Regions:
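Helix-to-loop junction immediately C-terminal to a conserved catalytic motif
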Residues: 53
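Conserved ABC ATPase "signature" region
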Residues: 118-133
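A short, proline-enriched helix->beta-strand linker immediately N-terminal to the Walker B motif
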Residues: 157-161
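ABC ATPase NBD Q-loop/coupling interface
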Residues: 13, 62-79, 182
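Conserved ABC ATPase signature
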Residues: 138-142, 146
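ABC ATPase NBD coupling module
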Residues: 69-85, 111, 229-232
Length: 237
């Protein structure tokens, strides 16, 4: 089991009160599958991704990731940090506007003490359909689809086992969305990765997922297998 979560709770302080945003969920994801969380904005989907990515450490419950027991307030380090990567909804926000794309690639390599190798970066870009000269450009010189491809390529540099996808195509035009989704499916097979996808788009969920769960008000209220997703039973009213 790549992700094994029991009774996960997350609360945020709001003045003198606490807002309970994730309420005792159980989540189990097998190696090699794409599991998706579908739900409206604000239901807690992205909060779960942030917990699993190690970006949010104030939670309660029991969690195992990649066979390793995780404790609240634990900092992800070493192989665990390298093997769990995240692609955000807006790649522009994760790329420094005054840094060339080459620097965006060099930073994760430096963090994990991996030698900087232009051939490796060139290969990562080629896998997502981008030319090598992209590294000399700034984020604002790229289209939204190109920036998302850069974000995916940067995550692939570290050869993660688990890729967390937070609304990865919602900021893109429909035609570009399809290209990115097909690219993600291809890369998953080539690299034997596991995906945890968050989306409010039923078509994206159906296209990508082996299984999915509906999240409402901080709880997982329904689960869908591949057959149910194919029939569109997961569609929100």
């Amino acid at each position: 089991m790549l992700i094994d979560i029991h009774d996960l709770h997350v609360q945020f302080e709001q003045g003198k009160q606490a807002k309970h945003v994730v309420k005792g969920i159980n989540l189990h994801v097998q190696q090699g599958e794409t599991f998706s969380l579908i739900g409206r904005s604000g239901c807690g989907k992205s909060t779960i991704l942030r917990v699993i990515a190690g970006l949010l450490t104030h939670w309660q419950g029991n969690m195992s990731l990649l066979g390793q027991t995780i404790k609240p307030q634990q900092r992800f380090q070493g192989a665990l940090r390298r093997n769990i990567q995240m692609v955000f909804q807006d790649p522009y926000a994760s790329l420094h506007p005054q840094h060339r794309i080459e620097r965006a690639f060099s930073e994760p390599l430096k963090i994990h003490q991996i030698p900087f190798d232009k051939d490796t970066i060139k290969q990562a870009l080629a896998q997502v359909g981008l030319p090598a000269d992209v590294t000399s450009r700034y984020p604002h010189q790229l289209s939204g689809g190109q920036r998302q491809r850069v974000a995916i390529a940067r995550a692939l540099l570290l050869q993660p086992q688990l890729l967390l996808l937070d609304e990865p195509t919602s900021a893109l035009d429909m035609s570009v969305q399809a290209e990115i989704l097909n690219l993600l499916n291809t890369l998953k097979k080539e690299h034997n990765m596991t995906y945890l996808l968050v989306s409010h788009d039923a078509d994206v969920i159906a296209h990508m997922s082996d299984r999915a769960a509906l999240m409402e008000n901080g709880e997982l209220t329904q689960h869908y297998d591949r057959e149910a997703l194919s029939k569109g039973i997961h569609r929100l009213d």
